[in-house]
Design a protein with these regions (language model features):
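Predominantly five- to eight-bladed beta-propeller fold
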Residues: 1-34, 219-232, 285-295
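Structural motif
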Residues: 19-21, 66-73, 118-123, 164-170, ...
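A structural motif specific to WD40 beta-propellers
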Residues: 33, 82-83, 132-133, 180, ...
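Conserved beta-propeller blade repeats
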Residues: 7-21, 36-62, 68-76, 81-113, ...
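Serine-hydrolase catalytic core recognition
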Residues: 54, 60, 188-494
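Short loop/turn segments that connect beta-strands within beta-propeller blades
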Residues: 26-30, 76-79, 126-130, 173-177, ...
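Residue-level recognition of beta-strand->loop/alpha-helix junctions
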Residues: 36, 85-86, 136, 312, ...
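Short flexible coil/turn linkers enriched for glycine and charged/polar residues
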Residues: 16, 65, 116, 163-164, ...
Length: 494
């Protein structure tokens, strides 16, 4: 197969980082003015925005350690640093993900998102750095900022609830700080707000509802009108029984889990089970939406006689900082505890065959799958596993992601060593299939190639498959091939 060499910038955790500059290109003169972002050169320039008058550029500057952020203002015409509006500091990490959004009609008031109180919320600021008020409040995060009314008096946003399962649309009065939820029914509400802020479109689903679309005024007491009600697109098909459960975590919090049982479920039978795992940052797999956030291949496996389970353990998204940051410096440890809590739940069910439990995951989920198949804490639990695009040693993963959650290998050698999975190969008892795209720029092919090499050295047999020219995810028509292989592997070995 012909190949071409494609170079990418990929500094490993603990290595020298690339240096980034930020420039303003003048389309009239053809000149570029670079912002004087200063030293140290190893810093992250994130969430760039403009003031409405186009005179200034605002940048969230994050240090290499990612535990401090400075929100800085620069002169767009000269590149000169003007001032720091405010700072944010954490004993774990700061991770600004949204640029400043200016209030319509104002050149000096903007909304900033921050998790400084433990949950991601909205704050109204002035460009002198003064915070006017916190707009959203509660033990749940803002999950989306929709925008403003034309006159700038109100803003609109979406939040999760305290369970993390549901989503609601809110409006807030920027003048007096009052806020109000626009919908009550449990489920996932996604909003579209009219330009003047008078009307909202509510796109709603929950476990029992494929999709309803409502329109309503945003004023208090407004009645919503059903504009569209989708029929069940799967009503002619046999689908599994999807349900939620809440599990006690060893960390003292409740974990959301989703179970899909065969459509012809018989309580007197013993079923094999598959845990589909991710459990990494920024991902939530279990939501009170149509099919519970599950995917169609899970329904397929349920139809083939498997129980499919997913657990959002500590470290996953939309449960607040304490939940999400509990894994700091030890990626993989608490996540394993929580996934094994799910296994214990399965083993306690009379309809599960405890000797036939498998696990499947991709990317961070591939890391978790390999951990669960080989680390001593899970010895003998899983009969087989499938690890796709797996991180196998965090010292070989990219700098920004890894150092945010683990610090550097020099600062945290114990954490990196504990979660390097090559050392656990000797513990492998069940069947393990490892899959990788040969052009993966996210988790380099080196991870799994080295794993195979170490298996050879230690006399351990694994199954290995590559997708030529695919990157981190197998996409296009080849994805059908992937899931056929997954199904066959579980049928053959579980």
């Amino acid at each position: 197969m012909p190949a071409t060499d494609r170079k990418i910038r990929y500094p490993y955790a603990g290595s020298k980082s690339h240096h980034v500059t930020l420039g303003v290109f003048d389309t009239q003169s053809g000149k570029t003015i670079y912002l004087n972002t200063g030293e140290p050169a190893e810093q992250y320039l994130t969430n760039v925005s403009w003031t409405p008058d186009d005179k200034y550029v605002l940048v969230a500057v994050v240090n290499r350690e990612q535990n401090q952020m400075w929100f800085k203002q620069f002169d767009a015409a000269t590149g000169a640093f003007v001032k720091t509006l405010f700072e944010e500091i954490s004993d774990k990490w700061v991770e600004p993900q949204h640029p400043a959004v200016f209030v319509p009609g104002s050149n000096n008031r903007f909304v900033w998102q921050s998790d400084r109180d433990g949950f991601n919320h909205l704050y109204l600021y002035e460009t002198d750095g003064k915070v006017i008020r916190q707009i959203s409040k509660g033990k749940f995060p803002v999950t989306s900022m929709y925008g403003f009314s034309t006159d700038g008096s109100h803003c609109f946003f979406q939040t999760a609830d305290e369970t993390g399962l549901n989503r609601y649309v809110w409006t807030a009065n920027l003048k007096d700080g009052s806020s109000r939820r626009l919908n009550e029914e449990e489920g996932v509400h996604n909003g579209i707000i009219s330009q003047n802020g008078d009307w909202a479109v509510d796109i709603f689903s929950n476990l029992a509802t494929p999709r309803f679309i409502y329109t309503q005024k945003t004023t208090p007491g407004a009645v919503r009108n059903l504009a569209f009600g989708a029929k069940n697109p799967l009503e002619e098909y046999q689908v599994g029984i999807t349900k939620f459960t809440s599990l006690p975590s060893p960390g003292g919090v409740r974990l959301n889990a989703r179970l899909i049982l065969p459509a012809n479920y018989d309580a007197g039978k013993k079923y094999p089970a598959i845990i589909y795992v991710y459990n990494g940052s920024h991902v939530q797999m279990v939501t009170n939406s149509w099919m519970g956030g599950g995917e169609m291949w899970m329904q397929r496996m349920a139809n083939e006689g498997y129980v499919v389970m997913s657990i959002d353990g500590r470290g996953s998204a939309n449960r607040g900082c304490e939940f999400e940051q509990s894994t700091f410096r030890h990626l993989g440890d608490f996540e394993m505890e929580d996934q094994l809590t799910g296994v214990q739940y399965l083993q306690a069910q009379s309809y599960i065959d405890p000797a036939r439990i498998g696990v499947f995951g991709w990317s961070f989920g591939g890391f978790m799958t390999t951990s669960l198949m080989t680390r001593p804490e899970a010895k003998g639990v899983f009969k087989c596993g499938i690890a796709g695009g797996p991180v196998l040693d965090w010292r070989m993963y990219e700098i920004m992601y890894t150092e945010r959650y683990m610090d550097t290998p020099q600062e945290n050698p114990e954490g990196y060593t504990q979660n390097s999975l090559y050392q656990y190969i000797g513990n492998l008892d069940g069947r393990l299939l490892m899959i990788h795209g040969t052009s993966d720029p996210v988790v380099l092919w080196q991870h799994s190639l080295k794993y195979v090499q170490e298996c050879v050295k230690k006399g351990k047999q694994i199954d290995y498959f590559v997708y030529p020219e695919h990157e981190h995810n197998v996409i296009g028509p080849d994805r059908a091939h992937l899931y056929e292989m997954v199904e066959r592997y579980f049928k053959d070995h579980l």
